[in-house]
């Protein structure tokens, strides 16, 4: 499987404008404080597991013992996000 293959995509909510899962990374397009946008990349080798799903937010554990939070469009999209993540890990 190519590293640019798209496994999951959601338009996100709040500051998160686009959430994508690829075979080796999670890409998030975030809206900045002053209206700008930037892409944040989290590599899957740094993710140790899913901490919890609360509503439409997904909390992931990483190696630094800090939480990565992703806000998706709906609770069902959050569950699909976790399922796609479990498929890759």
Model-derived regions: residue spans:
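Acidic, Ser/Thr- and proline-rich intrinsically disordered linker/docking segments
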Residues: 2-15, 27-30, 34-89
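Broad, structure-driven detector of short, well-ordered beta-strand segments within folded domains
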Residues: 17-23
């Amino acid at each position: 499987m190519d590293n640019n293959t798209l496994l999951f995509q959601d338009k996100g909510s709040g500051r998160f404008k686009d959430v994508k899962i690829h075979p080796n990374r999670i890409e998030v397009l975030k809206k900045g404080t002053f209206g700008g946008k930037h892409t944040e990349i989290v590599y899957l080798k740094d993710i140790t597991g899913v901490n919890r799903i609360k509503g439409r937010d997904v909390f992931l554990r990483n190696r630094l013992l800090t939480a990565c939070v992703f806000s998706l469009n709906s609770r069902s999209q959050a569950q699909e996000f976790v399922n796609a993540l479990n498929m890759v890990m």
